[in-house]
Amino acid sequence: MIRRSSLPVLPAAPVDLVAVAVGGHQVILAWTECGAGGLGFRIERAVRNSPCRSFVEIGEVGPHVAAFRDGSVKPRTTYSYRVQAWNASGDSPFSNVVEVTPPQHETELPAD
């Protein structure tokens, strides 16, 4: 007798990850979800000039949420980000890696 697994297949990797610094203390991330079946996304960050430069998980979002706000960044520090989908079967490959450096001064929006 052949038994089929009831576990879902691994989710596909998120694609088109982008990062935008909003002032000196926030970074907004956005990506495209590829396919269904994920239970959420893990967001990881690394600091460029740190001794280890290893990625560390900084947050999670639920399924069909394709954005994240990192409010724990410092101005003039370069950060790398990547995102991974997950489900009961395991983790997807990572998305593309993006880098962003928040500016020293807050971003000013033009007046209307």
What are the residue ranges of the model-derived segments?
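Pro/Thr/Ser/Gly-rich low-complexity, intrinsically disordered linker/stalk tracts
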Residues: 1-38, 75, 88-112
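Residue-level recognition of well-ordered beta-strand positions that form the cores
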Residues: 30-32, 44, 84
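Recognizes extended acidic, P/S/T-rich segments that occur
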Residues: 41-76, 88-96
